[in-house]
């Protein structure tokens, strides 16, 4: 991504710095936000379309067999363990058996169908979007707008959607709730676009570049596993760590 000019992130030598100028620079990119005290974090602003291409290239190079346009349905449970998953495609229903199944649905669809225990919380829906053709984005950001600088000339990213957000919490596993949220959020997006064109000179001739493909949610189902992470675990390094976040957590 960096080679293609499709990513921006602070160099490792700056990570952890509390230099106000560096923090302010990264805030403009949306790499630092939330409650202080602030410091430079490892966080990346990237072009989502370029990111998709990079992921496709990486999986091909790793000899991963991809199967798109097929949707996971139910876990196949044998002797108390998941031995495979059924899928639905336009060619019909089929199953894939495996020694290890990883539920990467984000909503626990597979472990739920296997009967695993979970917690669930209703959340506010979001719909991020980007605009192009913005005249002098830096001046627009300086004026106090709720948007970030992003990759590409004259473009900004509007996080969490419009200023006037949807205030009804939804069950992110309920299709009726998701339908309501998508329609409501898309309406808010266009209202925000019209407002910015009307009120901000920088956006007078701006246009919508991209609206997020899916409703943004922070969580839905949480697996009740052998060990449940709690607030005391937030700053505790783990030997089996698999991911790092540069941002806040409410837990």
Give the location of each predicted region.
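A structural motif corresponding to the C-terminal end of an alpha-helix
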Residues: 58-65
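Conserved FAD-binding subdomain of flavin-dependent enzymes
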Residues: 3-7, 58
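Flavin (FAD/FMN)-binding glycine-rich loop and adjacent Rossmann-like elements that form
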Residues: 2, 12, 16-32, 36-37, ...
